[in-house]
A protein has these predicted regions:
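Residue-level detector of intrinsically disordered terminal segments
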Residues: 8-10, 44
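Protein-protein interaction/assembly regions in multi-subunit complexes
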Residues: 43-235, 240-307, 316
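Charged/polar low-complexity intrinsically disordered segments
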Residues: 13-14, 23-25, 39
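Residue-identity detector for glycine
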Residues: 6-7, 32
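Extended C-terminal regions of large enzymes
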Residues: 195, 202-206, 210-232, 238-484
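Leucine-biased recognition of intrinsically disordered, low-complexity hydrophobic segments
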Residues: 17-18, 28, 33, 38
Length: 484
């Protein structure tokens, strides 16, 4: 995607076709409704049930608790409320993988709307096993509106089950289910199996794959097999509690302040977003533009330009080669996710989620790999195992750089790694998701691996982390040098 003469800001606005005045009106609309709620009924918050569901896995019990009005007024949104719970209820020095750590799933008022872009978002908040500090991550799917329909604004899970278990939350409360038949299944298989058990394909479930079960520090949480709360290791926390999945289905309607006005505004947003040319091809459509403005990492943050490679893995070629179809979340016209259907070189079929921009950045430009088939296979391995692709790709880039700097031998890695080599990607991603071989070096994350590999020298070879976690695919320093 060429960068227009107006520069970065113009490119962003043109890419999403969301004029500044419309964004301002949207903000005023929501803030206006919020103020209206406070002025009209200080004791009642529209869009909320003022209820959380607290689950004790150790004792297999649950209870509904009231949420204080002042908390809802102060903390508009699921993430903020989850942060408050974690701060107040979790000891500062708690082991993230101990029963004393809590994992909180929360939604905001917008999830009460029947028809509104963005209401598929849910947040997970816990103490991260990767960073050792607070984490929040967000996913999508129909799970968030269903939690609201079940009568809850948040779900707080504490303790640890003696045996693998999964939860089914509905209008009547919480059911504890034996997860023996689910343990060991990948994230896609788990989602399908739960639908089969409950006899309803509409039911969404958050679940972990095998990586979460072995408490891999970069294990993610999957929703319905196609959306991921990827960062921070939330899947490892679920695994530490022997919690395989949380399914939810509800039929209750949470009151909102102005249902008619909300529906009207949602339709206007849909019309505007449907006109956006980039929504037709999802997040891969930004690959070439991000590389051109210097925002995409190249060669594990050491490279500068990769024009041809970005064009090779970005759209429109991405759409054509991978036989792409949109995979939108509930009530969202943007359609970030892509569904792919391809026949691999070995004759096997690969059908499922296609790699999005962050994955193209970490496993494509970040490793200088322009092979869409290899990137798609690696993406599928991570998705099914339940692993964050950003961290996994960063691990591979780091290992390759350490090998080139003679900090680690090919024998220890299990192969001779190279940038631009699809085989390096496929070999190492398999080791990383399983914590096997060289993958076991990352049992404490990339910083721990750096210390194991080269001590101080290993740490010096370790760029671009924050609080022990790898950065997203946005190279600010490179962008500034390109713009300058």
């Amino acid at each position: 995607m060429p960068c227009p003469s107006g520069g970065h800001k113009q490119w962003v606005e043109e890419a999403i076709l969301l004029p500044a005045e419309f964004a301002k009106e949207t903000a005023l609309f929501f803030s206006g409704l919020y103020v209206q709620r406070l002025q009209e009924r200080s004791f009642f918050m529209y869009g909320y049930w003022s209820k959380l569901c607290r689950v004790d896995l150790t004792n297999k019990t649950w209870k509904a608790e009231d949420i204080k009005d002042e908390d809802l007024k102060l903390l508009l949104g699921g993430t903020a409320f989850g942060c408050k719970i974690l701060l107040e209820e979790t000891p500062a020095k708690v082991d993230p993988l101990s029963p004393e750590n809590k994992i909180i799933f929360a939604v905001g008022p917008i999830q009460a709307a029947k028809f509104f872009p963005g209401n598929a978002k849910w947040s997970v908040i816990t103490k991260s096993p990767l960073t050792g500090t607070f984490m929040d991550s967000a996913g999508t799917g129909a799970w968030a509106p269903q939690l609201k329909k079940a009568g809850f604004d948040a779900l707080v899970i504490e303790g640890k089950s003696e045996k693998p278990v999964w939860l089914y939350i509905n209008d009547n409360g919480v059911e504890f289910k034996d997860a023996a038949d689910l343990w060991g299944l990948d994230s896609v298989e788990t989602s399908a199996k739960i639908k089969e058990i409950l006899g309803d394909k509409r039911i969404n479930a958050l679940n972990i794959g095998p990586a979460g079960e072995i408490m891999n520090p970069i294990a993610n949480i999957t929703c319905d097999g196609h959306s991921f709360a990827g960062r921070g290791g939330g899947g490892a926390v679920m695994g530490s509690k022997n919690l395989k999945a949380v399914a939810v289905w509800g039929t209750k309607e949470c009151p909102i302040a102005d249902a008619e006005g909300c529906d009207k505004w949602a339709k206007e947003m849909f019309q505007i977003l449907h006109k956006a040319t980039e929504t037709a091809e999802g997040t891969p459509s930004v690959m070439t533009g991000m590389e051109e403005i210097g925002d995409s990492p190249i060669r594990y943050w050491r490279g500068d330009v990769w024009h041809k490679g970005a064009e090779t893995i970005g759209t429109p070629r991405y759409t054509q080669v991978l036989n792409v179809k949109p995979l939108p979340c509930q009530n969202c016209p943007v359609g970030c996710h892509r569904h792919i259907d391809i026949t691999l070189k070995n004759g096997e079929k690969l059908v499922g989620n296609g790699p999005e921009y962050e994955t193209l950045g970490t496993m494509g430009s970040g490793l200088c790999i322009d092979d869409l088939e290899a990137i798609s296979i690696a993406n599928d391995i991570c998705n099914r195992a339940g692993v964050d692709t950003i961290s996994a790709g960063s691990y591979i880039g780091f290992l390759t750089e350490c090998y080139e700097a003679s900090l680690i031998s090919a024998d220890k890695i299990g192969m001779v790694p190279h940038f631009g080599d699809p085989e390096t990607l496929l070999f190492l991603v398999d080791k990383i998701v399983k914590n096997e071989g060289i993958g076991a070096y990352f049992k404490d994350g990339i910083r721990g691996a750096a210390e194991l590999i080269g001590g101080d020298a290993g740490l010096e070879a370790l760029p671009r982390i924050a609080s022990r976690q790898e950065l997203v695919r946005a190279d600010l320093s490179r962008r500034l040098s390109v713009i300058a």
